[in-house]
């Protein structure tokens, strides 16, 4: 895992699709596209920005890791996911993941998630939902068919930040590989303390400490983290503990009744 975060941030390489817990996602081959000078310049600028942010996250004692506070800051949004098992309150991070947050909030406002089931649940790993088809193969971003610059048809791009991690309670976009974000999302639920496995020259000290409470550090760098549970982890644990059948689908449907936007 050494240097995995920095390498992932700078190269934007996804680790695995959330369609499998530990195995890799098979991607279809395609001819490489020619990059323009503008694209190359933009990517270089973005990589440099990430390097600077990563250095700040690793060396600045006052670096801000918003997941570590339950307070909702002025530049954060707040929502409540009302499920058939109880309510989950989260704060969202538009500063660090603007596309994912806008996509989520727009879908929520339009009722896209109303009645959608948690189609994949693995105790001590995560709970996944957001697919109107209910089988893990559906769901689209708000830009599909409307803005090819953001969503070419396969989903919108991953957003990486050295200030956000797959800690216990972290809200993240599910994907089937690099830049394939649609509407599906998951909440990290693992309670295992993996902090001792994390290299101190790769993970910020505050994040290593936070991982003592659980989470999935192996997913860092492969998925867009865009929110954090601030109330209702007992509900997340309850959903995670439900009896499942084929493909980790709960035997009794657990649904999102609606998503209430408390603060944008």
How would you name each of these model-derived features?
Residues 1-16:
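Sec-dependent bacterial lipoprotein signal peptides
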Residues 6-7, 18-264:
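Cyclophilin-like peptidyl-prolyl cis-trans isomerases
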